[in-house]
């Protein structure tokens, strides 16, 4: 059997920055180091950091006063920021800069008392953080996941209306919802460029290009990873068997029965070493050597610098 490796795949610049932030903070700060929420949605990465001494918490209320705390790549609400400030935490913000960009747009809408429509998945930590940027008492922020949700909305002032999106959505679905928004509310304003991040778009584009060459797809990523699930969905919608896995032990021989070409990709929070472990396991369960070929795609050269406070600590070598 042949394996086609999607390109690009795996870690994006935001995830690389978040993981490196945690690892560097472990070097420059005294233990324990607390992280609010999973720093990225990947079980293998989180478990690895736990072994290094990181303490993951759901809320900053669980973090002792004056302790070291890191915000995850998904971002947090203004309320969480205020709670952290009251506890006098040594705070490192690993929020992805592309999520921060969405936050700025929502805060601007709030400052202008504009109603705001956020396209995203209910309960996702990024969505919770973005919704929590809105403070206007005169306007309101609404969460929608589909065009059906849009039809249920009642907007007070269509001429003072803004939209934003979660960064890890399906590109195709989101474009449809945005167009429906513009059709219903011609004066709606939004970001100059879609908020769906470059990495999410590039990984989805890579899968689409590969679909006609494969008859099964394995996506390396965790079940709670939004962007990994969107990759799997692309294959499923095209009628191709697709599986989401973040542990080599979960690879099943039956997935590859009567299959000639297996596509392999990875969500933006899955490390490359895990991709290689999954490939080795596929070869093992198939009881044969597999031919591995890189499928040509977009080259990514995006880099996000570490948080300012962390760069200062690294530069001076001081632990205050």
From Swiss-Prot:
It is an enzyme of class 1 (oxidoreductase). InterPro entries: LytB/IspH. Keywords: 4Fe-4S, Iron, Iron-sulfur, Isoprene biosynthesis, Metal-binding, Oxidoreductase. GO terms for molecular function: 4 iron, 4 sulfur cluster binding; 4-hydroxy-3-methylbut-2-enyl diphosphate reductase activity; metal ion binding. Dimethylallyl diphosphate binds at residues 41, 74, 124, 225-227, 269. The keyword Oxidoreductase applies. It catalyses: isopentenyl diphosphate + 2 oxidized [2Fe-2S]-[ferredoxin] + H2O = (2E)-4-hydroxy-3-methylbut-2-enyl diphosphate + 2 reduced [2Fe-2S]-[ferredoxin] + 2 H(+); dimethylallyl diphosphate + 2 oxidized [2Fe-2S]-[ferredoxin] + H2O = (2E)-4-hydroxy-3-methylbut-2-enyl diphosphate + 2 reduced [2Fe-2S]-[ferredoxin] + 2 H(+). Isopentenyl diphosphate binds at residues 41, 74, 124, 225-227, 269. Pathway: Isoprenoid biosynthesis; dimethylallyl diphosphate biosynthesis; dimethylallyl diphosphate from (2E)-4-hydroxy-3-methylbutenyl diphosphate: step 1/1; Isoprenoid biosynthesis; isopentenyl diphosphate biosynthesis via DXP pathway; isopentenyl diphosphate from 1-deoxy-D-xylulose 5-phosphate: step 6/6. Binds 1 [4Fe-4S] cluster per subunit. It comes from the Bacteria. [4Fe-4S] cluster binds at residues 12, 96, 197. Its cofactor is [4Fe-4S] cluster. Its EC number is 1.17.7.4. GO terms for biological process: dimethylallyl diphosphate biosynthetic process; isopentenyl diphosphate biosynthetic process, methylerythritol 4-phosphate pathway; terpenoid biosynthetic process. The active site is at residue 126. The keyword Transferase does not apply. Belongs to the IspH family. Catalyzes the conversion of 1-hydroxy-2-methyl-2-(E)-butenyl 4-diphosphate (HMBPP) into a mixture of isopentenyl diphosphate (IPP) and dimethylallyl diphosphate (DMAPP). Acts in the terminal step of the DOXP/MEP pathway for isoprenoid precursor biosynthesis. This is 4-hydroxy-3-methylbut-2-enyl diphosphate reductase. It comes from Francisella tularensis subsp. novicida (strain U112). The gene is ispH.
């Amino acid at each position: 059997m042949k394996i086609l490796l999607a390109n690009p795949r795996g870690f994006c610049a935001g995830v690389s920055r978040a993981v490196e932030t945690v690892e560097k903070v472990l070097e420059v700060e005294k233990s324990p180091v607390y992280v609010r929420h999973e720093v990225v949605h990947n079980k293998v990465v989180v478990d690895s950091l736990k072994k290094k001494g990181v303490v993951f918490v759901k809320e900053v209320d669980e973090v002792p006063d004056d302790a070291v705390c890191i915000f995850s790549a998904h971002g947090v609400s203004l309320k969480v920021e205020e709670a952290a400030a009251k506890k006098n935490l040594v705070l490192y913000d690993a929020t992805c800069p592309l999520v921060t960009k969405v936050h700025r747009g929502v805060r601007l809408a709030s400052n202008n008392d504009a109603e705001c429509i956020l396209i995203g998945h209910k309960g996702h930590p990024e969505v919770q953080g973005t919704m929590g940027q809105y403070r206007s008492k005169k306007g309101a922020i609404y969460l929608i996941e589909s065009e059906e949700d849009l039809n249920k909305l009642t907007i007070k002032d269509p001429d003072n209306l803004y939209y934003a999106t979660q960064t890890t959505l399906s590109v195709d679905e989101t474009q449809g919802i945005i167009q429906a928004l513009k059709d219903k509310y011609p004066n709606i304003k939004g970001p100059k460029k879609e908020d769906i991040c470059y990495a999410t778009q590039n990984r989805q584009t890579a899968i689409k290009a590969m679909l006609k060459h494969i008859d099964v797809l394995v996506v390396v990523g965790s079940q709670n990873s939004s962007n990994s699930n969107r990759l799997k969905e692309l294959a499923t919608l095209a009628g191709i068997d697709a599986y989401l896995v973040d542990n080599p032990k979960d690879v099943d021989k039956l997935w590859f029965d009567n299959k000639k070409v297996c596509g392999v990709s990875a969500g933006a929070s899955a490390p490359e070493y895990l991709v290689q472990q999954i490939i080795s396991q596929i070869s093992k369960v198939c009881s044969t050597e597999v031919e591995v070929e890189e499928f040509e795609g977009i080259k990514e050269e995006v880099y996000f610098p570490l948080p300012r406070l962390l760069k200062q600590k690294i530069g001076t070598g001081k632990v205050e």
